[in-house]
Amino acid sequence: WDILGKKTNTPLYQLVGGKCNDQIPVYGYGMMLQKKSTSELINLFQEEAKQIKSKNFKAMKMKVGLGPTEDLKLVRAVREVVGKDFKLMVDANHAYNLNDALYVGRGLDELDIFWFEEPVAPENYDGYRELKQKINTNIAGGEAEFTKYGWNELIKNKCIDIAQPEVCGLGGITEYLKVSALAQANFIPVINHVWGSAVSIAVNLHLLTAQPDMPGGLFPSKSMLEFDTTEKNIFITDLPTESFSIIDQVNQNNGFASVSDIAGIGITPNLDFLKEFEVNE
């Protein structure tokens, strides 16, 4: 896709359907679990949440996985500092069995959490479906589905309210487009899972730029770009030869980022940087 874009002097978003969105809201992902007491984590998470909000991100996502009771303490603490109207998401990375996930999910309902991500094992379609039926918080997932066939099962079994395809995990843009179309054909909003380098972020920004709104009345559902705020990632800062800063855009544009019109994905890897990771047999 990148070669085709460069060959035809066309940005990726034009190749995959054209611009549907001038700007994409960005949410900050942080608040990772550490080997600390719950009280220490509460203090750390609250400070990190304040920082993410102060940088103009439109929403934020936090980790859980200490156990149901301790996790709800963490979420309540973060909700307290960001306010009741700020969009907050919770990512469990399939930390729970079904009963524990139901307990946590009912607690999240009371805290007006936007989504509960990967609450149970990705293979547990029955568990996902039961959670979706019994709690009000949106169930999000799909980053661990690596083919359109797996996604078809996830959707057919009515497991999720929000689809989170991971373009890198799916093997690339072509398979992603099939999965995205499948989700949209079943009226499931697509909010991509984003993890990795500047290449991944740039590709996702193009894909979301070309993503049509989901039906939903006067104010249809909008997607968001996930951005890791946890630490400096040299594969974001040092990999591209071009100036590429999502943080600067978020700060300057009130939480939004826009794609460039550079041909292809808009990122040219710095070959000298990549040589540091070269493996010689």
Language model feature labels by segment:
Residues 1-88, 93-102, 106-110, 236-281:
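N-terminal capping/lid subdomain adjacent to the active-site entrance of alpha/beta enzymes
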Residues 15, 66-82, 97-101, 119-132, ...:
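Active-site-adjacent beta->alpha loops and helix N-cap segments on the catalytic face
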Residues 28-30, 62-64, 90-94, 118-120, ...:
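A cross-domain feature marking catalytic cores of carbohydrate-active enzymes
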Residues 106, 112, 123-140, 145-256:
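Shared catalytic-loop signature of beta/alpha-barrel
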